[in-house]
Amino acid sequence: MLAAGEDPAYQPPDAPLSRGLEVHPAGQSPDLKVWIDRSIVPEGYGWIFPAGDELRIGVGSFDPRFHVKDNTVKLADDLGADAVGFQGNWIPHKLRDAVEDGIFFAGDSAGHCLPLTAEGIRTALYFGVACGRELRSVLEGDKTREQALGSYFAFSASHEWKYKWLLRGQKILPRIHPPLAQRIIEAGNRPSFLNWSFNHYWNIATPDIVTATPSPARRTVVPASAAA
């Protein structure tokens, strides 16, 4: 379930969601490959990457109304792999308020998946750690519940500008003519640029939060709906 909030339309396929599906055939490959190919998916990308003794082959669509099953099966077939072990879901790709009605949200329920890549496990752990610290501070008597709600809301909201930039990238990518997109990718395929861009991407939700105290969040207006 996606938190309903004040908008009852915040449910698939009307909500800001991506749609992803992958298969897990047996096999091995040394490479991770991503295809930005409109014959596979008009708005999104296909992928293959190794995972132990199996492969992950899938299709992700930024448009939740685009059905990805047939194209996932076709991609697996084109790669000579069996379409078995299906796994997929809706992927919220827009950041939402992380508190509402006295409840703390982390992960998909708060829109913590990264909009351009749909990565969600790392971000769920990252915001989950921050949320857990606030809950612990309440249990230990260091904060009131309302203070913890406000602190966690501000922490999540302080990442909004990063999510907005990734969302802009998601919207722009399908509108770039494929040959131009290929040239842009080739031009950016330099170690210095790759290291710079990956480090910025990684630092959106760095695992260092486990051992380091997060930087104080900027002052943020907490919505009235945060309180129970």
Segments from the language model and where they lie:
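Generic low-polarity alpha-helical segments
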Residues: 1-3, 131-132, 152, 184
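Predominantly flavin-linked oxidoreductase catalytic cores and closely associated redox partners
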Residues: 1-99, 111-112
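A general structural signal for well-ordered alpha-helical segments in protein cores
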Residues: 18, 69-72, 103, 124, ...
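Contiguous hydrophobic segments
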Residues: 19, 23-27, 34, 60-66, ...
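Electropositive phosphate-/nucleotide-binding environments in soluble metabolic enzymes
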Residues: 42, 65-66, 118, 122-125, ...
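Short, charged/polar low-complexity linear motifs in solvent-exposed/disordered segments
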Residues: 51, 67, 73-76, 124, ...
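Conserved mid-domain beta->alpha element of the FAD-binding
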Residues: 55, 94-162
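C-terminal helical "tail/cap" subdomain of flavin- and related membrane-associated enzymes
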Residues: 136-228
